[in-house]
Curated annotation (Swiss-Prot):
GO terms for cellular component: cytosol. It is found in: Cytoplasm. This is Translation initiation factor IF-2. Belongs to the TRAFAC class translation factor GTPase superfamily. Classic translation factor GTPase family. IF-2 subfamily. It comes from Psychrobacter sp. (strain PRwf-1).
Length: 905
């Protein structure tokens, strides 16, 4: 609490000024006016007085209990060792000192300090008096000798006698001075000294005495300052103890802080008490030691040695808690977090348990949870993005860009499979791409730029098959305008709706192209009506979505569609910087024999030149060559231009961004960071074993796995097939992709398929010669595909073969027992009438009595008249005998069989 005036204090406690003034007077404080200040110490004294007057009793004692459990190995009488749990319980009691006793101790210490000071002053005065008396006696003796020797002796004799007397008198004076501290010194042989030597000696002794006095005064001042600091600290602690509850002081933000201070003070006071006891020895002993000690200190000071006083222990004030600035990433390990806060990991895990999070020291927690932990422990959390290295690189590249110009639009053609997307693009390009594709469907993202009369337009052709959802999503994110192709004779289909959702999610403008208008079954109004169900209202129906009716076969409406594209591009005012480092997106990547990794990219900013250092995903390398979509070599590519580049060490992931960097060291650092992050994610996915997954895996002993090794021609197709295969998994058969990659099938793939009993599938790739020889030797069948339908259908068939068959029961016939007679051969025989179906001799039967199953077994005999027969049809009589059971009149004989039905995915 800060210093406050009496009026502010009255407002704070909602009392009148006069009432507060009366309380201050009752508490023993001087009277004050309403504008006078009340210090913090006086406020604490007032609160203590009010608590005491209201009858509140202080808690002076607090007990802390601890319990530790350990295990010990004990050898019994039989010689066998066993584990014994050992529990150790400890109890510590902390008692708050009585303020009255504390005040008495402070007063006693002050009195002891004053007495010590007086004794030191008296001893100094005694030394001065003894020295002064010795000097006076020496001066008187010298004067008397001069007077006696003033007569008729020769000058030489006078000098000798005078010097002899001076030496004798000086020896007596020195002996008298040494008797002052009551210590006898043996007489030495007198030495004759000259007047100059005597004067130098006296000067030296005076200087040494002055230095001793200065040193004694300095030590006295240091002792007084240390005593004052200790007493001030005790007064503060006494003030705190006088009005605070010791139990309440153990708060979350300063656990055991007061206890540590108290222990430090008690230890310091105990040492001071021991020093006082040792210092209360006889004054005579101290007097004998002091002079020798002072002389040693003077000699040490001259030689640069430290005094023994410097090594003496003094009480130091406890250091306050250090607040750390803790940097926290998006994910952080508990042990690392504890290390950054300079605490034990156990304390962090305990705090997490209180928050409801049960984690170990080597597990990761998110950034929000870690920030709460850091704040709870009194430190400053500093959130740091895990992509800081990438962000810094991006900022450095952005600073070098300039010269913003208009760029061509990037248009993505989307729609359902077989609705004519590629045919429309062929008509615009005047090529025949669709006829050359496997199955007549697009299975890659194709990027083309077309020079029309209205300017350059870049087209992205996406696949429409359901398995290529990720490809369509990437196409929508990298584009400026989406052309939604809908067949006039087919209408809205699932992939059409998905394309609309992708366009909305990316915020891309939409242009509807109703294709196949040349067909007689075309119904554009039905298409427009179906589009309104997805809230796509065209301009023809009063909406804001442009629409064109086209025919990719005849070319009808193509010019109108291109006009709509250019108009939309002008409204969007598409611009991009042409100078500086290039940046864009990887559309597709693949491995080609003799060329290595080939990446199809779309430049979005800047200009890409041959020889630039490109960072794409986890890989970086220099651009060795660039080609356009027709295979023609180019030297540079500006914004909105698609090209294929060579020079990367491996195929980057489709959809990842690429960036041209100038510093190879920085590129390596970012690439290694991304690769490490990807490895950690894969390892986390593989080793993730949580409680939920443990319950899911229980009871799945009969679960079957179909192991697959998949190789494709491009990265995008690989991702699409992996997602499609994962969706095929059921509760009984799981598809497990052991290995996957881009490029031809190698010998290592065949070896892996042999060891893991996996199916080896190739999509638009072939096995090399070494792989073929290895497959023939191991008897492994390699399956090749060029259409995604065939691959998925074959995997489904393989999974269906791994399913356990379904058993279904079929009732074949029912016969009623009309009479029962005895047979010497079969025992009880029944005469029956077949009322439904056919009764078979070699099939299983049930005996129903009162419509309840009484017996299940086999027929022993089936006869028609006296002939044994294998079956009896409905409406005919027969005789039968049931093996191991006696039937009765009125029973029903039900004949059935169990059929196995092979299930399919």
């Amino acid at each position: 609490m800060a210093d406050k005036t009496v009026k502010e204090l009255a407002d704070m406690v909602s009392k009148t000024v006069s009432a507060v003034q009366k309380q201050l007077t009752d508490a023993g404080l001087p009277a004050r006016g309403e504008d006078d200040l009340v210090t913090e110490l006086e406020q604490e004294q007032l609160v203590a007085f009010l608590k005491q007057s209201h009858g509140q009793k202080e808690k002076r004692r607090i007990s802390l209990k601890s319990k530790t459990t350990s295990t010990a190995r004990v050898t019994g009488s039989s010689g066998k060792s066993k584990s014994v749990n050992v529990e150790v319980r400890k109890k510590k009691v902390f008692e708050k000192p009585d303020p009255n006793k504390l005040a008495e101790e402070i007063a006693a210490r002050e009195q002891a300090a004053l007495e010590a000071k007086k004794r030191a002053e008296e001893e100094a005065k005694k030394r001065e008096q003894v020295k002064k008396e010795a000097e006076e006696r020496q001066a008187a003796t010298l004067a008397a000798m001069r007077a006696n020797l003033g007569g008729g002796s020769s000058s030489s004799d006078k000098k000798e006698e005078l010097s002899t007397v001076v030496v004798k008198k000086g020896s007596k004076a020195a002996a008298a001075a040494k008797e002052a501290p009551k210590k006898k010194v043996a007489q030495t042989k007198p030495k004759v000294e000259t007047a100059a030597e005597r004067k130098a000696r006296e000067t030296r002794e005076a200087e040494e005495e002055r230095l001793r006095q200065i040193e004694a005064e300095t030590r006295r001042k240091q002792a007084e300052e240390a005593q004052k600091k200790t007493l001030e600290q005790m007064r503060k602690m006494a003030g705190k103890y006088s009005d605070k509850d010791p139990v309440a002081e153990v708060r979350k933000d300063e656990p055991l802080a007061e206890g540590l201070v108290g222990e430090a003070l008690e230890e310091s006071f105990e040492k001071e008490r021991r020093e006082i006891k040792r210092g209360s020895a006889s004054t005579a002993t101290r007097g004998r030691r002091r002079k020798g000690q002072e002389e040693r200190e003077i000699r040490n000071r001259k030689h640069g040695l430290k005094s023994s006083q410097a090594s003496q222990h003094k009480f130091e004030k406890p250091v306050e808690k250090i607040v750390h600035d803790v940097e926290i990433g998006e994910q952080i390990v508990v042990s690392d977090l504890a290390q950054r806060m300079a605490v034990k990991a156990r304390e962090v895990t305990k705090l997490l348990m209180k928050m409801g999070e049960i984690v170990s020291a080597d597990q990761e927690i998110d950034q929000a949870t870690a920030s709460l932990i850091v704040e709870e422990m009194g430190h400053n959390p500093i959130p740091v993005s895990d992509t800081k290295v990438e962000d810094d690189l991006q900022e450095a590249v952005e600073e070098r860009r300039s010269n913003v110009q208009t760029r061509p639009p990037v248009v993505t053609i989307m729609g359902h499979v077989d609705h004519g997307k590629t045919s429309l693009l062929d008509k615009i390009r005047e090529t025949k791409v669709a006829t050359g594709e496997a199955g007549g469907i697009t299975q890659h993202i194709g990027a083309y730029h077309v020079e029309t009369d209205r300017g350059v337009i870049t087209f992205l052709d996406t696949p429409g098959h359901a398995a290529f959802t990720a490809m369509r999503s990437r196409g929508a994110q990298a584009t400026d305008i989406v052309i939604l192709v809908v067949a006039a004779d087919d209408g809205m289909m699932p992939q059409t709706e998905e394309a609309i959702d992708h366009a909305r999610a990316s915020g891309t403008p939409l242009i509807v192209a109703i294709n196949k208008m040349d067909k007689s079954t075309a119904d554009p109004d039905r298409v427009l009506n179906e589009l309104t169900t997805k809230e796509v209202v065209t301009e023809a129906w009063g909406g804001d979505v442009p629409m064109a009716k086209i025919s990719a076969k005849t070319g009808e409406g193509i010019d109108e569609l291109l006009e709509l594209i250019n108009l939309q591009a002008e409204l969007m005012e598409l611009e991009a910087p042409t100078d500086g480092a290039a940046q864009g997106v990887v559309i597709e990547s693949r491995l080609e024999k003799g060329r290595g990794a080939v990446a199809s990219i779309l430049v979005k900013k800047g200009t890409l030149n041959q020889g630039d250092l490109v960072l794409a995903g986890e890989f970086y390398g220099k651009v060795r060559a660039m080609t356009d979509e027709t295979g023609k070599r180019v030297k540079s590519a500006g914004p909105s231009i698609p090209v294929e580049i060579l020079g990367l060490p491996d195929t980057p992931a489709a959809g990842s961004e690429f960036l041209v960097v100038s510093d190879e060291k920085k590129a390596r650092e970012v690439a290694e960071f991304r690769a490490t992050r990807e490895r950690e994610r894969q390892l986390e996915r593989q080793n993730k074993m949580r409680l939920e997954s443990m319950f899911e895996q229980m009871g799945q002993d009969d679960l079957s796995f179909l192991n697959i090794i998949l190789k494709t021609d491009v990265r995008g197709t690989l991702e699409a097939l992996l997602a499609a295969l994962e969706d095929l998994s059921t509760d009984e058969v799981k598809v497990k992709v052991i290995s996957s990659g881009v490029g031809p099938i190698a010998e290592s793939d065949v070896t892996l398929a042999e060891s893991s009993e996996a199916v080896l599938l190739g999509f638009n790739v072939r096995a090399d010669n070494a792989a073929k020889r290895k497959a023939d030797e191991a008897g492994i069948d390699i399956r090749y595909y060029s259409v995604i339908y065939g691959l998925i259908d074959d995997v489904k068939a393989a999974m269906s073969g791994m399913l356990s068959p379904e058993h279904r029961e079929k009732i074949l016939g029912i016969a009623e027992v009309r009479d029962v007679f005895r047979s010497s051969k079969f025992g009880a025989a029944a005469g029956c009438m077949v009322v439904e179906g056919t009764i078979y001799r070699n099939k299983s039967i049930r005996v129903l009595r009162d419509d309840k199953v009484a017996f299940t077994g086999q027929l022993q005999s089936l006869r028609r008249y006296k002939d044994d027969v294998n079956e009896v049809r409905s409406g005919m009589e027969c005789g039968l005998a049931v093996r191991g059971y006696d039937v009765e009149v009125g029973d029903k004989i039900e004949v059935f069989e169990i059929q196995e039905i092979q299930r399919t995915i």
